[in-house]
Amino acid sequence: MGDWGFLSALLDKVQSHSTVIGKIWMSVLFIFRILVLGAGAENVWGDERSNLVCNTNTPGCDNLCYDWQFPISHIRFWVMQIIFISTPTLVYLGHVVHIIHQENKQRELLKSNPMAKSPKYTDENGKVEIKGSMLGSYLTQLFIKIILEVAFIVGQYYLFGFIIDHKFICERSPCMRAECFVSRPTEKSIFIIFMLVVACVSLALNVLEIFYLLCRRISRRSKKCRQAMYNGESRYPGHFTTELESMNGMRHNEFNVAFQNKWSQRKGSLDAAKPEA
């Protein structure tokens, strides 16, 4: 686990600049990926090559058949997966550190020059609010993590599958049709399924976090619009009432004019008809 210390320390710093769902994703990464992989994977997969037995006398067939069946070790594959999945988060952390550094300078400048621009993304405690360019950066790293998660899940399926059989038929020359037997296939299959479930949970959390951020942004915008409308009504309380009254008055006047014109026409026709009688 000592090899994971540096990565864990970096990812731990991201938690204070993430949403609630992002913190849950980080916990899943720490506990169910890094911790489980570091503590249990070596015990389960430590004998994957040494205990592979093929029923052939051809020298080197054990190595050839193992390389044919498992192009990359499961442990190395999962280590690569964790590193690639964590990279977008670390890039986002770099962006956060840059923003904090820039706004600390602005805060110092604000003390000597009250007319200077106020910090936009951070408060006095250095806590970052996810909005504007920070929101774009956060959503970008989420989309990249989703793509990488899907790519590794599909890649694992095509490389190994999700279940390990107790034996396989080697198809690599000169060991064609040799039967090879894998040690502890059930235990390995359970571990593979566990890591697959964790990857799917991480993927679902990333998708859920995107919807959460978008819904929160929409909610904030609608709240600002309602606040702006309220401020406009409170600033000009009689404006909307006066406008409505004026419109009603105009309609009433138009109705009166039309009625008078029609009455004048009828009266004129009656006056014209009297001499003839």
Curated annotation (Swiss-Prot):
Pfam families: Connexin. The keyword Transferase does not apply. One of its GO terms (biological process) is cell-cell signaling. GO terms for molecular function: gap junction channel activity. Residues 41-76, 165-189 are extracellular. It is a multi-pass membrane protein. Residues 2-19, 98-143, 211-277 are cytoplasmic. InterPro entries: Connexin, Connexin_CCC, Connexin_CS, Connexin_N, Connexin_N_sf. Its main location: membrane. GO terms for cellular component: connexin complex. Belongs to the connexin family. Alpha-type (group II) subfamily. One gap junction consists of a cluster of closely packed pairs of transmembrane channels, the connexons, through which materials of low MW diffuse from one cell to a neighboring cell. A connexon is composed of a hexamer of connexins. PANTHER family: CONNEXIN, CONNEXIN 28.1-RELATED. This is Gap junction Cx32.2 protein. The gene is cx32.2.
